[in-house]
Amino acid sequence: ALHLWIVPRIGDFRPSLERLATRTMGMPVQIGALQAESTGWAPSFELREIRLLDAQGRPALSLPRVVVAISVRSVLSLNLEQLVLDRPELDVRHTASGQWLVAGLTLGTPGSENSAAADWLFDQREVVVRGGTVRWTSERAHQSTGHHPEDAPALTLTDVDIVLRNALHRHDLRLDATPPTEWGERFVLMGNFHRGLLSSHPGNLKDWRGQAFAHFPRVDVSHLRQHVRLGVDLLSGQGRLRLWSDIAKGEWASGAADLDLQAVSLRLKPELQPLGFQQISGRVSGHQGEHDWSVSTQQLAFVSDQGLTWPGGNVSVKYSQAQGSQHAKGLVQGEQLDLQALRDVALRLPLPEHWHARLNDHAVEGQVRALRLQWEGPADAMQQYQGEIDADQLRIQNVAASNMRGPGLQGAHISAQFSQRGGQLQLKMGQDSWLSWPGLLEEDAVTVQQLQADLRWQLQGQQLNAVQWKAQLSNEDLQGQSQGQWQPLASSQLGMLDLQAQVARADAGKIYRYLPLGLSADVRRYVRDSVRKGRVNGLQIRIKGDLDKVPMAHARDGEFRFAGHLQDVDMAYLPPALLPAGSLPWPTLQGLQGELVFERQ
């Protein structure tokens, strides 16, 4: 019947086809000319000068040539087997409210996501566009960069080839197009989507789920940001880009990007400083939900705008806001990380302000082999947390202007596990290393040639409840080991210390450097001024008791004893600082051999 009855008389059906198309599309349709060709099982029809009219009767879309193929199957379902559009010109706009306008015609009406035209289009088996021109405008993308949506610029794509294939609840799309020269080279977009079994409107994009893919062999991302909603503000960058986007309910839910870009600058949130890279390559993935977000990298290598090099480590950050009775949650994981580069990047990530303050207060360098931190509650008052870190060539220095400066170190390898209940740490240091703990020793920093230490601690709430350690230290001044524990006392400001230390050798003239500030200033000055040079061997140190009572004047207060063998020691028994003004100096004792004991006072 198709070949013998319809094909020879196709011209007679033009008015009927116009009425059918008008009823199906939901807008007036005019067909200038119609002819048919009978080839094979599926006859084809060529339509020329097709016009779709808007509500005012003006042409909203003109198609110079359209080829339509039908079959018995398509006729029975009132659809087309194939629809081919040659050299069409289309205006496509994605409005700030999320509506789609094609040639000024709305796919869907206000308050409804359904559109007869969209349903018809996505119900055809195959739609092909050849050599078209598309003017693409995204108000939503323009609005996401902080501009007024009505000022969104149009991107004109030429030589546009599109293939759309629709099956039951499935839609596959491919678009190849050439952008303006300054924008980049010809690119490809692909999408594979499906709808739920209960979806009755193919054109309702809110029912669509699936994945979209884009490949840009050469692109200037500063132009891309005006036309594609990326979830981040890409300020500049040129190079090669591949994008994957997961679509849920017709909206971007998550995605990934393979990068090979130069001169990149992006801003993750308006209040943050831009992230800048001289060069960056690898994969970046992200997710932005209503109450959560995540960022991760795979084999990402870059040179920052400050010249810092990241050779290719992996890191991921996840954060969920508090909702009702559910606490905020966070997770940071990483491996093969450069800490200095990571700190620079982290200051530009949307992390809690408390974290930014901590990072600004510390200079950090080193390589992290593995890192994991998981927590619940506000980041500045974590209710539960646990983590572990394995780092090498570590340097941490407090650079805060505040007088409350914390400990620091350089040239360390650490392995630590910790939680809100406590933790443990293994520390190793070698040549040209140093330790710093302002407020603990006479001098801020202690140089290290070799150090091994095991440290354990317990926490009760936000308070340190107990500390235990074992350590071996060697440097130019001394070689020795110590073990002990510390715990707080309600009646003491400095707490209770139980320390045993053995110093195999020590430079007698440098001992004052290692005296704790818990000792009175008079004692520390006396040791510094009186012991000029010499060696101390077999030094035994014992401190036990309330540190507020050092040097333990009474036996009931505890123990305080330093005892060792002296060799070739020069000592000013009464240093000038202790003599009355104008007094003659006491003779210096030289070449002393014997035993020196400091016990209590």
PLM feature spans:
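Outer-membrane beta-barrel translocator/pore domains, especially the C-terminal barrels
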Residues: 84, 91, 258, 263-296, ...
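Elongated, acidic membrane-bridging lipid-handling scaffolds
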Residues: 72, 106-228, 235-240, 246-248, ...
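Outer-membrane beta-barrel proteins
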Residues: 70-74, 113, 197, 246-249, ...
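Secondary-structure transition motifs
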Residues: 27-28, 44, 48-166, 182, ...
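Outer-membrane beta-barrel architecture
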Residues: 80-82, 124-126, 207-211, 252-256, ...
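Short edge beta-strands and adjacent turn/loop segments
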Residues: 33-42
